[in-house]
């Protein structure tokens, strides 16, 4: 029963962390810099405060979003490469 209660606490902390991250992202803008700032702040707080499961795994785990940052990076590089290739092909076509 204690593991269930701890799991629910971690879930509640994660939900709270996600809400705070969303509010900050809406306020600061949805780009790489706010996400990077949130992740660095979350990692700093995790190391400095050494929080329990609710605040650490839950809140700070939901607050940080390393996977979303990686997805943004991969998407940026993929679409940049595809966009550059398509732009080059279009320019090459026009030159003929």
Curated annotation (Swiss-Prot):
Keyword annotations of the record: Cell membrane, Ion channel, Ion transport, Membrane, Metal-binding, Sodium, Transmembrane, Transmembrane helix, Transport
Residues that bind Na(+): 61, 64
GO molecular function terms attached to this record: fluoride channel activity; metal ion binding
Chain ranges passing through the membrane: 4-24, 26-46, 69-89
Reactions this protein catalyses: fluoride(in) = fluoride(out)
Entries under Pfam families matching the protein: CRCB
InterPro entries documented for this protein: FluC
GO BP term, pick one: cellular detoxification of fluoride
Record's keyword annotation contains Ion transport: yes
Membrane topology recorded in Swiss-Prot or TrEMBL: Multi-pass membrane protein
GO cellular component, one term: plasma membrane
Subcellular location: Cell membrane
Activity regulation description: Na(+) is not transported, but it plays an essential structural role and its presence is essential for fluoride channel function.
HAMAP family attached to this UniProt entry: FluC (MF_00454)
Function statement: Fluoride-specific ion channel. Important for reducing fluoride concentration in the cell, thus reducing its toxicity.
Family: Belongs to the fluoride channel Fluc/FEX (TC 1.A.43) family.
Name this polypeptide is given: Fluoride-specific ion channel FluC 1
Gene this chain is encoded by: fluC1
